Amino acid sequence: MGRLAVMTVWMALTLTGVAQAAGRPRYAVPAGFTRCPHATAWHGFFKWASQRDSSCAAVHRYMRVYAAHASGPRMPRHVAGYACRIHYWRDADGDIYASRNTCVRGRLVIRFYGMV
């Protein structure tokens, strides 16, 4: 009986962790990237940046240029020679509340999040 209780609790905790990981954005710096904690733009909407083969100062400048192009109904996918992939998170009503942008130009890669 004790073994069944332990297995039940273990499964509940494991499944809860998986559900939470899939639901909300999580700031993860991939291997080979450098975290840029002070790089923000658009009054803090764009934040949580990291870079590979660039510098945090360049990331900060790029995010400001990107923000200047982000005033339309859609997030831009091409800014300053970078091609950007965008992943969106939606709430229960289907409204976007966060995004992860991965922008690439040659070997340079900049990742940042947009959060309300």
Predicted regions and their residues:
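Processing junctions and N-termini across compartments
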Residues: 30, 50-53, 78, 97
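Extracellular secreted precursors and ectodomains with disulfide-bonded cysteine-rich loops/domains
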Residues: 34, 54-57, 82, 101
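Secreted, propeptide-processed cysteine-rich mini-domains
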Residues: 25-45
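Secretory targeting and sorting signals
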Residues: 2-23
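Extracytosolic low-complexity repeat regions of secreted or lipid-anchored proteins
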Residues: 61-116
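Short, surface-exposed binding/anchoring microloops in extracellular/periplasmic proteins
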Residues: 39-60
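Compositionally biased low-complexity repeats
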Residues: 20-26, 76, 116
